[in-house]
């Protein structure tokens, strides 16, 4: 039987939500009721499958940790008042911390003036953000297209490369095994995990994947394309594969890829959606090798954890294919004043507080500690690796990795696995995480591994 729409029900539900938004605190009964509602609504209206992947939901589904507010720059508080150290960072969006006051203030001030742009009058913050990114990014990157997410920034990059290279008779893209570039149809064609790809086959033609970090395989793909007339339009890469398990290529790999692109007339697209904005100890990970891409993709932390925003930045030569018809690729909400205000404030905080350098220093502290734990628990931990505050702990199997994440949750530390490598747990906290909290995270990790070791020995 078809369900009839109910304006009364929708009105009551929205009014209830607005009442919750206004509240600063909840009493015990309100907390219990909200937990039940959220779990029920996820089951019935969002996706019940999500609950199976949440460490914060008990097996019986009778309790779930429902987030309520940021506790500080580096912590989250649930409806029960429990405070968690955030070592997940919303998959890398909270580089400047939770509710950073500079970012929040910028958005609030803009909200009081003009939340969204008219689409006809020129919006100043879009222009100022584009100018700021031109100054901040490496090489000849000059023009920016703004959107709402990392996937959208990759879609724009692929379309831009196609528009530039199609008149030159080049149509093929090289991506890499283990890559993650998003899940929309174009970005998914570059993504390499079969679980995400197979239900939507066939994807866009013209994509081939080579092993990440293997410059010989990359060179062969270029050479074969030249021989067969299937010439390469662009290479799309993450400088460090995030969802692939925080996989670092050999030193000099990006430099050699850049040389191949120059030799064969291909564009180099760097997807820094996760590695950008100071995460790896430099503002952009490509700066570790002084490599300059033709197109750069940003998102996640660009909005300061307050507003969603993505950016595709390109050289004038490449971006000029959109000059005659700027409507070839547009988005209604991309580059809106609130998002641009957040991005400008985020960049200001990153530079004023020198957070990339802090990420390098504190990342070394964390990585040294995790490597020590790997030596102490070799039957549980296979490897610890990373750069800056993008760190991975690889366990011996998927179940051990999931158990570690659950134990860390009990220690009130949020971590999670990577999408393409389930046995790898990422440590991706705000760059504002204090040294004291870094030490607490390492202590919690030691406690978690000790508890896991006891379970292994009992078996």
Swiss-Prot record:
Which reactions fall under this protein's catalytic activity?
an alkane-alpha,omega-diamine + 2-oxoglutarate = an omega-aminoaldehyde + L-glutamate; putrescine + 2-oxoglutarate = 1-pyrroline + L-glutamate + H2O; cadaverine + 2-oxoglutarate = 5-aminopentanal + L-glutamate
For this protein, the record's InterPro entries field holds:
Aminotrans_3, Aminotrans_3_PPA_site, Class-III_PLP-dep_AT, Putrescine_aminotransferase, PyrdxlP-dep_Trfase, PyrdxlP-dep_Trfase_major, PyrdxlP-dep_Trfase_small
Whether Transferase counts among this entry's keywords is: yes
Q: Which cofactor does it need?
A: pyridoxal 5'-phosphate
Nucleotide-binding among the record's keywords? no
Which keywords, in A-to-Z order, does the entry hold? Aminotransferase, Pyridoxal phosphate, Transferase
**GO annotation terms (biological process):** L-lysine catabolic process; putrescine catabolic process
- Residues annotated as carrying N6-(pyridoxal phosphate)lysine in the record are 300
One annotated GO molecular function is: identical protein binding
Tell me which family the UniProt entry assigns to this protein. Answer: Belongs to the class-III pyridoxal-phosphate-dependent aminotransferase family. Putrescine aminotransferase subfamily.
Q: What does this protein do?
A: Catalyzes the aminotransferase reaction from putrescine to 2-oxoglutarate, leading to glutamate and 4-aminobutanal, which spontaneously cyclizes to form 1-pyrroline. This is the first step in one of two pathways for putrescine degradation, where putrescine is converted into 4-aminobutanoate (gamma-aminobutyrate or GABA) via 4-aminobutanal. Also functions as a cadaverine transaminase in a a L-lysine degradation pathway to succinate that proceeds via cadaverine, glutarate and L-2-hydroxyglutarate.
Q: What is this protein called?
A: Putrescine aminotransferase
Its source organism is Salmonella dublin (strain CT_02021853)
């Amino acid at each position: 039987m078809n369900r009839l729409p109910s304006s009364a029900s929708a009105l009551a539900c929205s009014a209830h939500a607005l009442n919750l938004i206004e509240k600063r605190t909840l009493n015990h009964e309100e907390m219990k009721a909200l937990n039940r509602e959220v779990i029920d609504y996820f089951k019935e209206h969002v996706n019940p499958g999500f609950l199976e992947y949440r460490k914060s939901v008990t097996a019986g589904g009778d309790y779930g940790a429902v987030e309520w507010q940021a506790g500080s720059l580096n912590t989250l508080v649930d409806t029960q008042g429990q405070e968690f150290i955030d070592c997940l960072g919303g998959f890398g969006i909270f580089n400047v911390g939770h509710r950073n006051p500079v970012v929040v203030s910028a958005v609030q001030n803009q909200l009081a003036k003009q939340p969204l742009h008219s689409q006809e009058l020129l919006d100043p913050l879009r222009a100022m953000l584009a100018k700021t990114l031109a100054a901040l990014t490496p090489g000849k990157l000059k023009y920016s297209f703004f959107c709402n997410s990392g996937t959208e920034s990759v879609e724009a990059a692929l379309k831009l490369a196609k528009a530039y290279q199609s008149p030159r008779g080049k149509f093929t893209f090289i991506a890499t095994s283990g890559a993650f570039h998003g899940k929309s149809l174009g970005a998914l064609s570059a993504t390499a995990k079969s679980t995400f790809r197979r239900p939507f086959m066939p994807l866009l033609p013209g994509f081939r994947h080579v092993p990440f970090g293997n410059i010989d395989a990359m060179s062969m793909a270029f050479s074969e394309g030249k021989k067969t007339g299937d010439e390469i339009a662009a290479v799309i890469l993450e400088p460090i594969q995030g969802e692939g398990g925080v996989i670092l290529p050999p030193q000099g790999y990006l430099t050699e890829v850049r040389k191949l692109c120059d030799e064969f007339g291909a564009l180099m697209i760097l997807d820094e959606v996760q590695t950008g904005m100071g995460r790896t100890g430099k503002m952009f990970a490509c700066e570790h090798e002084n490599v300059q891409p033709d197109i750069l993709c940003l998102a996640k932390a660009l909005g300061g954890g307050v507003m969603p925003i993505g950016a595709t930045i390109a050289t004038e030569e490449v971006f000029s294919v959109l000059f005659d018809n700027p409507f070839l690729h547009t988005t209604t909400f991309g580059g809106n004043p609130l998002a641009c205000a957040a991005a400008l404030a985020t960049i200001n905080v990153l530079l004023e507080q020198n957070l990339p350098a802090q990420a390098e220093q504190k990342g070394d502290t964390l990585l040294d500690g995790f490597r020590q734990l790997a030596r102490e628990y070799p039957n549980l931990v296979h490897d610890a690796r990373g750069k800056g505050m993008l760190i991975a702990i690889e366990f011996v199997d998927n179940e051990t990795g999931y158990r570690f994440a659950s134990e860390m949750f009990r220690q009130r530390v949020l971590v999670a696995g990577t999408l393409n490598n389930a046995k790898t747990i990422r440590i991706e906290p705000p760059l504002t995480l204090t040294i004291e909290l870094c030490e607490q995270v390492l202590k919690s990790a030691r406690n978690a591994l000790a508890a896991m070791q006891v379970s292994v020995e009992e078996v």
